[in-house]
């Protein structure tokens, strides 16, 4: 008798994706982050659902409803902090996942990579709108500053901003629509993640060497299911350490003050995972230029396959490219630090230099290093 998992129409899909899937036999722990992102997404949808049961998206009661969740709802505080810090864990996994793709040349799977970039944009939009919902000072001023960037678009900018606001300032209409979008986007992300997996399973996974691995495959279950469970346990451990011991470590104290349109927050800054892009935005004195640099800082990922000049796919055997990659990582950490600092000397010049370095490393030095390595191979 044939096993039900191989005959049942639904079970067959699950079987081919998670059980009998042929996987390369040498993929390292850097390949764990895909499954960890899936776990984060499920966790965020579940905690978000329970928060939405008690949250009210009205400017007069939003802040109070979040306080009510933390004080009066059974285990509301843990649900709230799991959701807030879950977003941080989500982005840590995401940055690791993208970094792995860049290092090992996974961007040569064009469809998978491009869907991944769309997923990144969708996640950034979701996180931004979620940050507005508690209606604290940083929520309000963050929403005002970031939505205002659209006014840099020539001719239609001002109308576009007022259309998004639903009025002449960030107000009740803005909060209500942000809540609606924040609720629907994770389900769109789930659908996109399924398409991401669909395209990945058309080609099969990459591996650390970047070499075609059809001649050496192993079943996904039990080898990689066990490996994924270990990763999941470590993720949950890290998340719960954050939630139970330092829930406000990554948050902003200003967001514990209710939103006040008459009083500007002293240092307007987004959550830590957007600081690198925020630093690039601030480093250009021109508004439109800053917005373009901000968008390009993420869109640069789409250009990666076109900028790949090496004869080898992975960076595993390319020491010059490895050096440039790790300098890029250090540069991104520098930008993250600068994004959280006030706009004054010496932070302004450091931010500008780090922004120039970011684009220089990605667009110029990376392809140059690959070409040099190609020539060294001939010796």
From Swiss-Prot:
GO function terms (MF aspect): metal ion binding; ubiquinol-cytochrome-c reductase activity
Record-annotated membrane-spanning stretches: 33-53, 77-98, 113-133, 178-198, 226-246, 288-308, 320-340, 347-367
Chief location of this protein within or outside the cell: mitochondrion
Keywords for the protein's UniProt record, in alphabetical order: Electron transport, Heme, Iron, Membrane, Metal-binding, Mitochondrion, Mitochondrion inner membrane, Respiratory chain, Transmembrane, Transmembrane helix, Transport, Ubiquinone
Record-listed heme b b566 binding positions: 97, 196
Cofactor: heme b
Co-factor note (free text): Binds 2 heme b groups non-covalently.
Residues binding heme b b562, per UniProt: 83, 182
Similarity comment: Belongs to the cytochrome b family.
Entry function: Component of the ubiquinol-cytochrome c reductase complex (complex III or cytochrome b-c1 complex) that is part of the mitochondrial respiratory chain. The b-c1 complex mediates electron transfer from ubiquinol to cytochrome c. Contributes to the generation of a proton gradient across the mitochondrial membrane that is then used for ATP synthesis.
Quaternary structure and partners: The cytochrome bc1 complex contains 11 subunits: 3 respiratory subunits (MT-CYB, CYC1 and UQCRFS1), 2 core proteins (UQCRC1 and UQCRC2) and 6 low-molecular weight proteins (UQCRH/QCR6, UQCRB/QCR7, UQCRQ/QCR8, UQCR10/QCR9, UQCR11/QCR10 and a cleavage product of UQCRFS1). This cytochrome bc1 complex then forms a dimer.
Protein name, entry field: Cytochrome b
Native source species: Hippotragus equinus (Roan antelope)
Taxonomic lineage of the native organism: Eukaryota, Metazoa, Chordata, Craniata, Vertebrata
